[in-house]
From Swiss-Prot:
Any Gene Ontology CC annotation: immunoglobulin complex
Chain segments annotated as transmembrane: none
Name of the protein in question: Immunoglobulin heavy variable 3-53
Gene: IGHV3-53
Region (Complementarity-determining-3): 115-116
Cellular compartment(s): Secreted; Cell membrane
Main location, first listed in the record: secreted
Region (Complementarity-determining-1): 45-52
SMART domains registered for this protein in UniProt: IGv
Length: 116
C-alpha cells in the first residue's frame, strides 16, 4: 500500500499591530493520510478566551483558506473541507489555542496560521 508523506508547517500571525503580543506555535510534523496531528498556539499579551481566534491555512501555490474559528463564548465553526475531522479548542488556563486534526488527507498539506 502506498502512503503519501507530507509536511505540515505551523506558523502564526496576529492581525493588526499591537505591542507585546506574541504567538508561539508547536505541533507541525511529518504525517501520512489517515493520521492525526495537534497544532498549538500559545498566546501572550492578550487573553485568548476574550477574543475570537481562527485557524487559516495556505496550501502550496494557493491562497489563504479559512479553517475554523472559536468565539469568546465558546461557539465553534468549521470550513466544510475539515468539518468532522478537525476540532478547534482552547485552554484558558494556558492561554493556548489548539487545532486537533484527524483523518488527515494529502490536501490538508499547508502552512497553518493561528490568527486573532
Amino acid at each position: 500500500m502506498e502512503f503519501w508523506l507530507s509536511w505540515v508547517f505551523l506558523v502564526a500571525i496576529s492581525k493588526g499591530v499591537q505591542c507585546e503580543v506574541q504567538l508561539v506555535e508547536t505541533g507541525g510534523g511529518l504525517i501520512q493520510p489517515g493520521g492525526s496531528l495537534r497544532l498549538s498556539c500559545a498566546a501572550s499579551g492578550f487573553t485568548v478566551s476574550s477574543n475570537y481566534m481562527s485557524w487559516v491555512r495556505q496550501a502550496p501555490g494557493k491562497g489563504l483558506e479559512w479553517v475554523s474559528v472559536i468565539y469568546s463564548g465558546g461557539s465553534t465553526y468549521y470550513a466544510d473541507s475539515v468539518k468532522g475531522r478537525f476540532t478547534i479548542s482552547r485552554d484558558n488556563s494556558k492561554n493556548t489555542l489548539y487545532l486537533q486534526m484527524n483523518s488527515l488527507r494529502a490536501e490538508d498539506t499547508a502552512v497553518y496560521y493561528c490568527a486573532r
